Amino acid sequence: MALNGKLRGRFNNFYIKELISMYTLSQTSLDKLKGVHPNLVNFMKELIKISPWNFKITAGVRTAEEQNKLYQQGRTVKGIKVTKVDGYKLKSNHQVKYDGLGYAVDIGVLVTEKVIEKVKENGKEVEKEIEKTVYKGSWKDFHYYQDIYNKAKNAGLLEKYGIEWGGNCWKSFKDAPHWQIKGADKVAFK
């Protein structure tokens, strides 16, 4: 069975990364893990090393105000709805629990792509193919997060650290960037 070009490219990239690449979290990502439950921090540090895709931490602990700002998207502020919890009546697992820790992290997949851009060479504007790192965070990018989840599951990291993925832990809402401590919904807030 022959693979179409797009799938073949994705497979080859996945296979090559599997063999030769090991990603690491940036200092910015590590800073965003401050105040997060240690199991989740250790999970993220181990996951990035085996992930088929590079990623960054986009959110760790959030205040009620930060959570509410996200809640307003698609409601009182232009954009799509990204959460069902407002930070006040309903709290997010990103918010501090009774033990002073956040129980959730969001990631953003980073993919290097070839793009055509206009650049100046010798005083002339020309089109040139360049490699650029692109953030993959839309619904059509779900497969990147699914790949990461599958790798974590197959490596036994979910069980090892007691983690669940937002892409499959709720029936009514798929939150692909979201990872949390299993059972976090039952842990009391501060």
Q: Positions of the model-derived regions?
A:
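N-terminal amphipathic/basic-hydrophobic helices that include classical n-h-c signal peptides
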Residues: 1-21
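Short loop/turn and capping residues at structural boundaries
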Residues: 59, 81, 167-169
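Short, surface-exposed glycine/acidic/tryptophan-bearing loops
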Residues: 65-108
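Extended, low-complexity, intrinsically disordered C-terminal regulatory tails
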Residues: 46-78
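Catalytic cores and adjacent binding grooves of peptidoglycan-active enzymes
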Residues: 91-190
